């Protein structure tokens, strides 16, 4: 069963929003098309966009409730066929609201076919004080596929002076190529816990973010180019693993981290995806 049929079976029986979105992209001639689109509940893509021409399909994943609360269970499945190129983002910050006890969850599964390029670039997630949630991302790449993905999380509404003092938020990310694990990370941030202030954690900053670039052609020259790009506030660093470039940010707000990632993306996209970087218009609204 796929994500949509699974959620249909559970939709009536579970509390909270039970939502699923399944997207399939295919290369047809010189054009990438959104060939399949199924959803249950309030999780949708309204239409395919082509601001860069036919070769790259942009899709904006919309969750009309605008946030996740305890008891919500969301799942997104994205499948890129061989040679397809898709960029997926969100219309604004995702929110994980305070929980009365139940946990919310978001599972993201992405399959990248041989020669395909998936750019998974959601806007930041804000974890409210008292939120309890689980975020899991699974990426499976075939052959020479390329994955460029980012995840940015702000613990507490820092703009309102709120800190994350209660609740807990668990994150898990795995990337595999042809069944071989390139990256596996698990973490849990507890409200008021030591990790928020530890120098090996957030070091007192509210925002943490990771940019993961999986490509067979990523090399030391690209790493050095990324290291030449400073973060305007907070701390940014990059490293190279076999077949994977990893950039980390922690800092006082989402905007400087987002700006740093955008500059890295501008460097990395032409050699890895064959196109100059063009920021999605939705990021400016």
Curated annotation (Swiss-Prot):
Keywords linked to the UniProt accession: Chaperone, Cytoplasm, Nickel insertion
Coiled-coil stretches noted in the UniProt entry, renumbered to this chain: none
GO cellular component terms listed in the entry, alphabetical order: cytoplasm
Alphabetized GO MF terms: nickel cation binding
Source organism, top-level taxon: Bacteria
Pfam families, per the entry: UreD
Subcellular location: Cytoplasm
Protein family per UniProt: Belongs to the UreD family.
PANTHER family documented for this protein: UREASE ACCESSORY PROTEIN D (PTHR33643:SF1)
Known function: Required for maturation of urease via the functional incorporation of the urease nickel metallocenter.
Subunit structure, as described in the record: UreD, UreF and UreG form a complex that acts as a GTP-hydrolysis-dependent molecular chaperone, activating the urease apoprotein by helping to assemble the nickel containing metallocenter of UreC. The UreE protein probably delivers the nickel.
Name of the molecule in the record: Urease accessory protein UreD
